[in-house]
Regions:
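Helical "substrate-binding/catalytic lid" subdomain
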Residues: 168-264, 268-293
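NAD(P)+-binding Rossmann beta1-loop-alpha1 motif at the extreme N-terminus of oxidoreductases
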Residues: 1-68, 90-91
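Hydrophobic beta-strand scaffold residues
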Residues: 32, 52, 116-118, 159, ...
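Rossmann-fold dinucleotide-binding core
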Residues: 97-177, 181
Length: 294
């Protein structure tokens, strides 16, 4: 049935993302069974043709492919552990966000019960689920990914299989979210900085967009430097860049703004300079990230 792209699917967990996943399966024509602790969250999906299971066990029995999306692995394991017998022989895809270590622990639990287990990470917000550009990362059971790749395409057209280690998809998830939250914090802080002098966010936003467009080319150089542990400072060294950060901090503090995130960056730069790397490029701070202060 998987090859026909109409495999019966079960979705456990109907938060905003779980509802989007179940809705995408329904839109693609998959018989879809849903379960959530708060049963009313299934109402809209049932109106679209989903079957509401009364219990997790009933939900699992209805699906050839079982997809879980809850708040963390503590919750997912609390739901799944009593269902080892029902899940045996089925394909389980866990799209819950958590640490690589917890994903590997869950994989070991599944392997001990004959459950074919694939871990995954959703890298888009709910409105993008089901679209060709929706990026989902998977790692773990290759057999599940290959057997149900067409089914999983209902969730997004940009699926990536990252290998047999169940911890890789969560690792990529957290690393990419690190980029996202750090960038968002920087953007919001910058808007607070210009806003303190009366510039609106809308006025300044075009300049942020132009500035972000410079980053991809810089990222290539950073990645090469990190892989080779070579951090040329010919285009800008840490000593020079630290002075620029000091100016930002001074300007922020003069306006009564919290400068915590940037102060942490400046402290990291200071450690690198103290270690004798003031002439290196910014990427050399990775050496200090790899040996955090006790």
């Amino acid at each position: 049935m998987a090859g026909e792209n109409r495999a019966p699917v079960t979705v456990i967990g109907l938060g905003a993302m779980g509802q989007a996943l179940a809705g995408a399966f329904l839109a693609a024509g998959h018989p879809t069974t849903v379960w959530n602790r708060s049963a009313h969250k299934a109402d809209a999906l049932v109106a679209r043709g989903a079957v509401r299971a009364r219990t997790p066990a009933e939900a699992v029995k209805a699906g050839e492919l079982v997809v879980v999306c809850v708040v963390d692995y503590e919750v997912s394991q609390a739901i799944l552990e009593p269902l080892g017998a029902e899940l045996a022989g089925r394909a389980l895809v866990n799209l819950t966000s958590d640490t690589p270590e917890r994903a590997r622990e869950a994989a070991a639990w599944a392997a001990g019960r004959g459950i074919d287990y694939l871990d995954g990470a959703i890298m888009v917000p709910t409105p993008v689920i089901g679209s060709p550009q929706a990026l989902l990362l998977y790692s773990g059971s290759r057999s599940v990914f290959e057997a149900y790749e067409a089914t999983l395409k209902a969730l997004g057209g940009n699926n990536r299989y990252l290998g047999a280690d169940h911890g890789v998809a969560p690792l990529y998830d957290l690393a990419l979210l690190n980029v996202f939250y750090s960038s968002m914090a920087a953007m919001v802080h910058s808007l607070a900085l210009v806003g303190a002098d009366g510039v609106t966010a809308k006025e300044f936003l075009p300049y942020i967009k132009e500035f972000f467009a410079l980053l991809p080319a810089m990222a290539d150089q950073v990645a090469d430097g990190i892989d080779n542990r070579n951090y040329p400072g010919d285009l800008g060294n840490l000593t020079m860049e630290a002075a620029g950060v000091d100016h930002i901090l001074e300007t922020s503090e003069a306006r009564g703004l919290d400068s915590g995130p940037l102060a942490a960056v400046r402290a990291l730069m200071g450690r690198a300079i103290a270690d004798g790397r003031g002439g290196d490029g910014f990427a050399s701070v990775i050496e200090d990230i790899r040996k955090p202060v006790a």
